[in-house]
Amino acid sequence: MVNLTAKERQLITGTWSKICAKTLGKQALGSMLYTYPWTQRYFSSFGNLSSIEAIFHNAAVATHGEKVLTSIGEAIKHMDDIKGYYAQLSKYHSETLHVDPYNFKRFCSCTIISMAQTLQEDFTPELQAAFEKLFAAIADALGKGYH
């Protein structure tokens, strides 16, 4: 369970309803793949990821980014049991994909930055703090399969 106040929960749900998973997901995943190029090894089926242009024009990056952000949107509906919500996905990432669990934190950081770029002046320090808490819980839940 993530320890969020009622105000933080309200900020998160209210803001998330304004988020376009397709746009933000592409931006966040693309940023991670470009900023941390070693993470590309988990996405070899995506084809050309050799440059920033290739990454941000890659349909598979956009599709997977949207999928991840849609999953986060669903997790927001389960804030009282994020670990339970992500239990199977955590197991899949650890046992099948062998993803470095720190990459979940990297992706969440890229998502925060992408949200700030998208929301601009609406991305207040209070909102950032709420999402930082939520994303820390999500990264922890996804890394749970490694323990």
UniProtKB/Swiss-Prot annotation:
Any GO MF annotation of the entry: metal ion binding
Top-level taxon: Eukaryota
Database matches in PROSITE patterns: GLOBIN
Disulfide bonds: none
UniProt cross-references to CDD domains, sorted A to Z: Hb-beta-like (cd08925)
Gene name for this UniProt entry: hbb1
Protein name, entry field: Hemoglobin subunit beta-1
Phylogenetic classification of the source organism: Eukaryota, Metazoa, Chordata, Craniata, Vertebrata
Protein's UniProt keywords contain Phosphoprotein: no
